[in-house]
Amino acid sequence: MPGSVFALMDAAKGRARAAGLGVIDLSIGSSDQPPPEAALEALREATRDPATYRYPLFSDTAPLREAAAAYLAGRFGVRVDVEREVLPLIGAQEGLAHLLLAVTDPGDTLLLPDPCYPPYLGAVAVAGLRVVTLPLLPERGFLPDLDAVPADVRPRVLLLNYPNNPTSAVADAAFFREAAAWCRARGTLLVHDHPYAELTFGAYRAPSALEAGLEGVVELHSLSKTHHMGGFRVGYAAGDAGALAALARVKGAVDFHPYLGIQKAAAVTLGLPDELGRAGARVFEARRDALVPALRDLGWEVALPQASMYAWARVPGLTDSVAFAVRAAETTGVAVSPGRAFGERGEGFVRFALVQPPEVLVEAARRLGTVSRDLPADLARQLA
């Protein structure tokens, strides 16, 4: 379903451009901000150093592992062994897919939130896992109810993501302590995808699942969102030594770690002053402050996000978010992500990526106020 939905959205954006509409694309969560200048300078220097051109071995990743360990200690108070409990990744998405291959067998059960980030579904499918969904409901703050999992379900992995994509919901340290305890009692690996760790607003600061202990917990960190380095494809996993050893064995068969120049840029970035990251977060906070009131003026239901780069809006009376999103793109040029693309529980919602300046977001909301929610017959046939 997600792949077909995004293909429909791409086609709708193409038709809008062909019709001469000024497209405002809020459907993809790719930061429009530049990476830190220090990261760019480190990369430029590395490209002029012939020593960086060879295959990077595990021993070559030590500076990045040490930088990640220092960040985890300084930001979360989490201490990791740089040899056993932190591992560089070619992006967190790569890390998750290979981690599931490393720690599960085909047919194992994975607990997956609904709605969720669509690439999770691909990683689960590649690993051949059985999925049991965890509804994320507004009345629970989009947090899963682990006590509602049937007693006969024995999951190998619980996959979480807070600050959350797509809902922008947040979790506190107590939630992660409870989730980790629940997992340890069942022999379940808790995997936490944490790409929005520093994209937080106001006084809120996102905790780490590793604060609940490293045993049975793996956390995936990325520089794509918080440091605007999506194209660099770099991140790291930290946590349970056994799970990371299994992941390292899988990665040893398929890659040689990120290019050394990119590792150097990432290591420099992780050591930058906290205020630089906070300044970047304030850019997205200002966008949130512009968009949310504009959507509420339309009568849409949207909570004020405390973190992430998204706004998750319920459109009153909406029963087909895909049809709505396609119609919106075709008739107004505003592209949003239909909630159904993130799972059944996403129906009735649309997701906005805060990747345009405040005035453009306000204009997008104005245009969306003109969109009909009627489902075109030809689109209904496509989705049948």
Spans of features found by a protein language model:
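N-terminal small-domain helix-loop-helix segment of the aminotransferase-like
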Residues: 2-91, 98, 269-272, 285, ...
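Conserved core of the PLP fold type I
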Residues: 52-181, 198-199, 204-213, 377-383
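Helix C-cap/helix->beta junction micro-motif
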Residues: 16-19, 127, 185-186, 298, ...
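Conserved core segment of the aminotransferase class I/II
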Residues: 210, 214-285, 372-373
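Hydrophobic residues in well-ordered beta-strands that form the structural core
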Residues: 112, 133, 159, 191-192, ...
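Conserved glycine-rich beta-strand-loop-beta hairpin in the small C-terminal domain of fold type I
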Residues: 267, 284-292, 302-314, 346
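PLP-dependent enzyme catalytic core of the Aspartate aminotransferase-like
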Residues: 78, 327-337, 342-384
